[in-house]
Structure formats: structure tokens, C-alpha cells
Amino acid sequence: MSSLPLIVLTALLAQSSAPAPDYAFFKERVQPIFLKKRPGHARCLTCHDHGSPPLQPLSPGAATWDEEQSRKNFAVWKQFIKPGDPLKSPLLRHPLAEEAGGDRFHAGGKHFKSQSDPEWQTLAAWVNGEKLDPKTNGGTQ
């Protein structure tokens, strides 16, 4: 008897147990990271409003994205994560210093020196399926 069906079933179960990325968490916690200016670096939006992967350009005079733009950003950026596995997610590896587990890719430089950086931790929380707690109006569950 072949063990192939068991291997396929195990792989499917592992995929189905991965947490789904949460839109509300993305909108309230992840998107502000894309807008934040960091010393020595441009904001993510500066390159990614016309780069790959893209962020929606801000509307004239807007400080953040509207609902439609946020949903488009979510649809694009969730493709650059591996739910449940931050270190296999390009969104987290590319801007992370190589000595901290990042890779050499990211023309925009290394925004995070370590995995303990609070913003890197926020991105990791999203990849790990963290959700906002509606009872605390934006707290996490």
C-alpha cells in the first residue's frame, strides 16, 4: 500500500489548520506600518505605490486608505504571507536584517533589525492569525 495518500492528507490538514489573515487586523494594525516613516528609510508606500507588490496610492489629501483601497491592499498583501509561518512570509523576511532571519531581497533596505521589533511583531501577529477584539474596540484576541 502506498503512503502517498497519507502524505497528501497530512499536507492538506496542515494547510487547513493555518490561521486565515484577518482583514480588520490588517486595516487597523498592519497598514499604519506601511505609512510610517523610519529613520534612514522611506515609507513603504513611497516605493510600493508603484512597485511590486503594490499598495494603493493614497487619495489626494488623505492620511490613510479608504475602505475600498484597504480591501485591495489586503487582497494583494495576503499573497505575500504564509499563514501561521512568519519566517516563510516574504512580507516579514524581505525587510528583516539577514542576521535576524531575513533574506537579501528588498530594494527598500532592512527596516527591522530583529524579530523583536514591535512593528515586525505586529506583522507576525497578523500572519499568525491574530484578530482584533471587537469588545475592546481594536484590542487583540
Describe these PLM feature segments.
Residues M1-L9:
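Sec-dependent signal peptide recognition
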Residues L13-Q141:
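Aromatic- and Gly/Pro-enriched helix-to-coil junctions and flexible linker segments
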